[in-house]
Design a protein with these regions (language model features):
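RNA pseudouridine synthases
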Residues: 2-324
Length: 324
């Protein structure tokens, strides 16, 4: 078991909410049922006083503190899975995750994950909640992730994520020809009928994605995106919501379609690109222990480079036929 302390301040816009609902928003890494249990077990302090009634209303600006014992991750099997380490010190490591690698074990993926690899290469990380994983990438999204090697580092990184102090930027290829960048500010929640999907929903959690155009091709647009929040599938759902799903994203409507009179080469590349075209290209954060500002970049993976190269060659071949 490992002891952790979570702390946060109730925001003014949360005034009138139930305590358990507020905690779910302040500490999104933990389930609402777990947070409710902690309330009922006298583990939640509100302005220094134990509060054990989940339906209690909050008023804004209260200081919340929770000190709990968390099960370590020894129930998962360590596995000798290679990790591409971009940076490492005593407190954190940054990895460049490949495609086809799930971050955390779950239904349908009991092993063969980033977490299993971390337990093998860093046995002591079993003492850290979630083996130090503070944010995730989807199975077929590539790129940068930060992992905490100690409980103090994990606690601070989670806090910084909640305060939106960690910058995460992505490159993507979206379906359709986009004319300008912008921001998608639409709340998100679990899809009402497809439980493995997410959806824009007026009663969901706040979700904000900024995007700008890097390059236009025939029928596709290359984007640079920045997450202001970090909801599950956020970029994929937001881009689909504005009718520009990510190329290759079968879940949210981005099935590749070759442009008119496309070359055999481009059609082959599109046919063989069997994931969403999304890569976590940049990560910027303040070191959780020494406070140093740090920044990393991950080059596009080979399949993404091949995709962009083929789309660019097709655009050059047909640009005289275009009116944009």
């Amino acid at each position: 078991m490992a002891q952790i302390t979570l702390s946060a301040t109730v925001q003014p816009q949360q005034m009138g909410q139930r305590l358990d609902q507020t905690l779910a928003e302040l500490f999104p890494d933990y389930s609402r049922s777990r947070l409710k249990t902690w309330i009922e077990e006298d583990l939640v302090l509100v302005n220094g006083v134990v509060q054990n009634v989940p339906r209690t209303k909050v008023y804004g600006d209260e200081h919340i503190e929770i000190t709990v014992e968390i099960e370590d991750e020894t129930r998962f099997e360590p596995e000798n899975i290679p990790l591409n380490i971009v940076y490492e010190d005593d407190d954190i490591l940054v990895i460049n995750k490949p495609k086809d690698l799930v971050v955390h074990p779950g239904a349908g993926n009991p092993k063969g994950t980033v977490l299993n690899a971390l337990l093998y290469h860093y046995p002591q990380i079993a003492e850290v909640p979630r083996a130090g994983i503070v944010h995730r990438l989807d199975k077929d999204t590539t790129g940068l992730m930060v992992v905490a090697k100690t409980i103090p580092a994990q606690t601070q990184l989670v806090r910084d994520l909640q305060k939106r102090k960690i910058t995460r930027e992505y490159e993507a290829v979206a379906c359709g020809i986009m004319t300008k960048g912008g921001t998608v500010d639409e709340p998100m929640a679990r899809h009402p009928t497809k439980r493995t999907h997410m959806a824009v929903h007026p009663m969901g959690k706040p979700a904000v994605t900024h995007y700008r155009i890097m390059e236009r091709f025939r029928d596709y647009t290359r984007l640079r995106l920045r997450l202001e929040t970090g909801r599950t599938h956020q970029i994929r759902v937001h881009m689909a919501h504005i009718a520009h799903p990510l190329l290759g994203d079968q879940t949210y409507g981005g099935r590749p379609r070759p442009p008119k009179n496309a070359s055999e080469e481009l059609m082959a590349v599109l046919r063989n690109f069997k994931r969403q075209a999304l890569h976590a290209v940049m990560l910027r954060l303040q070191h959780p222990i020494n406070g140093e500002m740090m920044e990393w970049y991950a080059p596009l993976p080979d399949d993404f480079v091949e995709l962009v190269t083929a789309l660019k060659a097709d655009y050059v071949l047909h640009k005289d036929e275009l009116d944009y």
